[in-house]
């Protein structure tokens, strides 16, 4: 699909227009000039004064037209004024595409990853729920159903973490272990098949211990508390029980006041990595929150996406984990996996019912740019928009019926049906780390391979991103440098605290 756009001369608007086009068409190119033929042409005209911006638009040759005006407030910065212009253009453009295609976008012009962050911001500024909801509807064209979902999640987050707006003086820590038994077809996380990598794993773990020691030392010196620790990857349980033991021992030795950290989670996503020895190690350090991710309860699907475990193994390892004291288990399901439709997804839900994990994350398949699945899209047959929407409706109904509540939400580019990923839990079993990472309310220090840090200014909320290299070889060569860089950022963020000591 090729759409020609007339009347837009600011390159900064190209990406938002492309993101909205992607909501309607899987393969879509936008052209801003030239004589190449296009499937259709959208003409946009912008009229701007000091007080307001008006955008008019039409799908040429169809009679479909739209116009919208937004006013600038007197105290707006240049950046805020540009955002107002961008949103006005997006408003008109979305309505033109909805009328032209007959497809309704329930998230309106929102294409960002964190919709609930927008609602948190409005409520924090002193707006009532009613005012905030009215603005989301009027300015962003978000439908009531999605606004209600956002509000339910915000309420649940504030119940789970009553001091959510005050945790900026603490940090959370993400520890990335980049190894897996095999790499899944949809995955773009740092994940390297662990077989035959013994030397590289050993070098990586040496660097990881170093990072933990230095970061922990700094946190202790400056009296900065840790809210949560999350071991992700990869699959952190891919390493041996002995390596896990040494790693958690380092965690207890290096980080401040570990026994009072609110939550420690270890992803054990691949059931084929879970053993009695590894569960005993988790027990030793009082870690009882893990993830075991079936993704699907169809063996054919697991084979197709490169997961070398069976449905039976998932169930067996779930029960083994329960027997060894794992009291807070999360499981993931993915809507829209290759070859799966409503029937297969309902089967996965009925299998989940037999286990009743404390939390269930329902992902919608996303075609991530660097994944094997995206590179070879022709090999993977996936469900259409309507069927994917039906599966999401089934997930919403099933979770409600079984006492689960939504507590976090995020969206991705190129996600099937422009839907969302929702984390559900039984009340009181929410993952605090997931809330922290989604709502961006505190600094998160990323340690290990591919680990992304977010340094959040405690006064302005400005976010500075910093990432460790994704591949173990690069990490092993320069982990000292990356540790030093993170400590510099921490010193900037906690400058006032630093000066007091």
Swiss-Prot record:
Disruption phenotype: Cells lacking this gene accumulate coproporphyrin-III only under anaerobic conditions, however no obvious respiratory growth phenotype is observed under anaerobic conditions. The hemN hemZ double mutant do not abolish aerobic and anaerobic respiratory growth, however a reduction of growth is observed. Binds 1 [4Fe-4S] cluster. The cluster is coordinated with 3 cysteines and an exchangeable S-adenosyl-L-methionine. S-adenosyl-L-methionine 2 binds at residues 186, 234-235, 295, 307, 332. One of its GO terms (cellular component) is cytoplasm. It comes from the Bacteria. Pfam families: Radical_SAM. Its EC number is 1.3.99.-. [4Fe-4S] cluster binds at residues 180, 184, 187. Its cofactor is [4Fe-4S] cluster. It is an enzyme of class 1 (oxidoreductase). Keywords: 4Fe-4S, Iron, Iron-sulfur, Metal-binding, Oxidoreductase, Porphyrin biosynthesis, S-adenosyl-L-methionine. Induction: Induced under anaerobic conditions and by hydrogen peroxide stress. It is also dependent on induction by ResDE, Fnr and ArfM. One of its GO terms (molecular function) is 4 iron, 4 sulfur cluster binding. S-adenosyl-L-methionine 1 binds at residues 174, 233, 267. Residues 163-405 form the Radical SAM core domain. The keyword Transit peptide does not apply. GO terms for biological process: porphyrin-containing compound biosynthetic process; protoporphyrinogen IX biosynthetic process. InterPro entries: Coproporphyrinogen-III_oxidase (IPR034505), Elp3/MiaA/NifB-like_rSAM (IPR006638), HemZ (IPR023995), rSAM (IPR007197), rSAM_horseshoe (IPR023404). PROSITE patterns: RADICAL_SAM. Pathway: Porphyrin-containing compound metabolism; protoporphyrin-IX biosynthesis. PANTHER family: COPROPORPHYRINIGEN III OXIDASE, OXYGEN-INDEPENDENT COPROPORPHYRINOGEN-III OXIDASE-LIKE PROTEIN HEMZ. NCBIfam families: PRK08207.1-4, rSAM_HemZ. Belongs to the anaerobic coproporphyrinogen-III oxidase family. HemZ subfamily. Involved in the biosynthesis of porphyrin-containing compound. HemZ is able to complement a S.typhimurium hemF hemN double mutant under aerobic and anaerobic conditions, however under anaerobic growth conditions, the double mutant complemented with hemZ grows significantly faster. This is Oxygen-independent coproporphyrinogen-III oxidase-like protein HemZ. The lineage of its organism: Bacteria, Bacillati, Bacillota, Bacilli, Bacillales. The gene is hemZ.
